[in-house]
Amino acid sequence: MTTVNWERFENFFTLYEKLKSVQKLIYVIGETHHVYVGSVGCKGGEGGLAVRYQPQYVERSKAIFGSDSPQEQPAFAGTFTNSNGVTCENVEDVEKLIQWAFLERGDRKQALFKRPNRRPNIKVEYCGDVPSFLRDKARGLGASS
């Protein structure tokens, strides 16, 4: 079973500053509206969020929205408890499973990502400060298809 430990941040900028060099990371921007689920560690993202979201793009997003921090828009980072044993396929499967969990709530219009073409057949345990749409799958219940 794969275990993902979640940490909640006030916003994406705070998450970015703290974890920009972490590899094999799942992240969620937003919780109930305008939600994006992504990951780093695969597809050339071995450098973490700092490679995916180069500093100039983070700064430009502040200019676009006219704010240093998103209003009422938390961000979450999910790190793997045993990242040495986690493969690129594991990272992508966990990302897809989290996307499915959000879409199953019926909030498809709030998703800023495309629906995955398949639901991964893996078991994942979530612990820590999980996004609200994953709480029923946290600690002990796991998630599988």
Segments the model singles out, each with a brief description of its role:
Residues 1-35, 41-145:
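Boundary/linker segments flanking structured domains
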